[in-house]
């Protein structure tokens, strides 16, 4: 039984154009309050982004749903997430595919995310402390790559780790950011602009 707060959020997401029932089901099954600071628990099921420390945020549920829907996942999809953050987006993905790989630049965030995911009995996830700009070459290629912070341009390493027919979804830009979907067709990459967005920057190189 879905409680009222969850149902209200699902109704909002449908009204905003989210159609994939598998994505909506995953959102209903992941307790967002477990991924936010106690001070923000009362806002956990509101359709807003929230701070998680270290200058990072847990994305607005609409944006999580939109980006996940754009990946057109199947259970067999090999997925790479850049920016584990709180682990919330990771958990949504873990309900949709057999295995998720996730890279986080900030060690403390990676540690807390791993703890939360284990507490929720989500064990089909591999996390790595590393530079998201470099992806995860040892686990490539991927059918789907999702980036939860904005680089000024699309990282070439992520393009090279995308399998034939694969999809990369990411925000791109500095002050003016747009959500892009990149599809690989042989040696070509087809890029679609989806909508204007606002994300924290994808920091290059420096691990924290």
UniProtKB/Swiss-Prot annotation:
Main location: cytoplasm
The protein's Enzyme Commission number: 2.1.1.77
Pfam families (alphabetical): PCMT
Protein known as: Protein-L-isoaspartate O-methyltransferase
Role description: Catalyzes the methyl esterification of L-isoaspartyl residues in peptides and proteins that result from spontaneous decomposition of normal L-aspartyl and L-asparaginyl residues. It plays a role in the repair and/or degradation of damaged proteins.
Disulfide bonds: none
Keywords, ordered alphabetically: Cytoplasm, Methyltransferase, S-adenosyl-L-methionine, Transferase
Protein family (similarity comment): Belongs to the methyltransferase superfamily. L-isoaspartyl/D-aspartyl protein methyltransferase family.
Organism of provenance: Cronobacter sakazakii (strain ATCC BAA-894) (Enterobacter sakazakii)
Reactions performed catalytically: [protein]-L-isoaspartate + S-adenosyl-L-methionine = [protein]-L-isoaspartate alpha-methyl ester + S-adenosyl-L-homocysteine
UniProt gene name: pcm
Biological process terms in GO annotation: methylation; protein modification process; protein repair
Entry annotation: catalytic residues: 59
Locations listed in the record: Cytoplasm
Lineage per the UniProt record: Bacteria, Pseudomonadati, Pseudomonadota, Gammaproteobacteria, Enterobacterales
GO molecular-function terms, A-Z: protein-L-isoaspartate (D-aspartate) O-methyltransferase activity
GO CC terms of this entry: cytoplasm
